[in-house]
Amino acid sequence: MGGINVIEIEIVPDHESASARVAGFIVEQIRRKPASVLGLATGGTPERTYELLVEKVNAGHLSFSQATTFNLDEYVGLLPDHPQSYHAYMRFRLFGETDFDAERTHLPKGTADELSDAGGQYEALIAEAGGIDLQLLGLGANGHIGFNEPGATEDSRTRVVDLTEETIAANARFFDSPEDVPRRALTMGIATILEAREIVLIATGESKAEAVERSVRGPVAPQMPASFLQQHPSVTFVLDEAAASLLDKRA
């Protein structure tokens, strides 16, 4: 890695189409390798993707029983049963609704006694599982992937980070008030993400258009964390027309 690669761009009409396409990537991966290691994301964007996967499992068309998962991040200080924790998000939207083996679903421990050790322990678990086959990403309006905020470095690993005011404001809709949003999170690093064998990023809506354009066409720089994806040999951005609106579609 380190060279610049062409990010594959798929543009679809709307969020529903994007969600279906990303669900298709995951279905294809599991059918190709039932014991796949999946990297998973949270937030509003992938919710419909997870709903579609639940429908496929419940219809008998898909099984996650042999799969292993690693989520990108978790808030620091929220217990796993806190309704806004990402443990609860995944349990409610995917894990508890399908046939995933709970022993093989992993999220960073934001309540670990020794947070300084939690990142290294998470990295070790990923390595022990053989690395991530397919990593799902969302995209923040400021270009963050996971909770790697602007300024994140290419060599960063799973660690505790401070959230920007922009990210706190964006996530406030999930909490009773902005004051309730945690100020720190435990997140996979840029280097961790780039070690996945394949990466699929979903971005929808006009609010993501500038970050998409800078990630795909702009220089690779810490101030636009998703731009580091240009250095990965197998990345696909699945975009709706609004998120792709600033791209030259002939490129």
UniProtKB/Swiss-Prot annotation:
Top-level taxon of origin: Bacteria
Pathway: Amino-sugar metabolism; N-acetylneuraminate degradation; D-fructose 6-phosphate from N-acetylneuraminate: step 5/5
Alphabetically ordered keywords of this record: Carbohydrate metabolism, Hydrolase
Its EC number(s): 3.5.99.6
GO cellular component, one term: cytoplasm
Active site: D73 (proton acceptor), N142 (for ring-opening step), H144 (proton acceptor), E149 (for ring-opening step)
CDD domains, sorted: GlcN6P_deaminase
Pfam family name, one: Glucosamine_iso
Gene Ontology biological-process annotations: carbohydrate metabolic process; glucosamine catabolic process; N-acetylglucosamine catabolic process; N-acetylneuraminate catabolic process
Reaction(s) the record says it catalyses: alpha-D-glucosamine 6-phosphate + H2O = beta-D-fructose 6-phosphate + NH4(+)
InterPro entries attached to this UniProt entry: Glc/Gal-6P_isomerase (IPR006148), Glucosamine6P_isomerase (IPR004547), Glucosamine6P_isomerase_CS (IPR018321), NagB/RpiA_transferase-like (IPR037171)
Job description of the protein: Catalyzes the reversible isomerization-deamination of glucosamine 6-phosphate (GlcN6P) to form fructose 6-phosphate (Fru6P) and ammonium ion.
Stated family: Belongs to the glucosamine/galactosamine-6-phosphate isomerase family. NagB subfamily.
HAMAP family: GlcN6P_deamin
Protein name: Glucosamine-6-phosphate deaminase
Lineage: Bacteria, Pseudomonadati, Planctomycetota, Planctomycetia, Pirellulales
Encoding gene per record: nagB
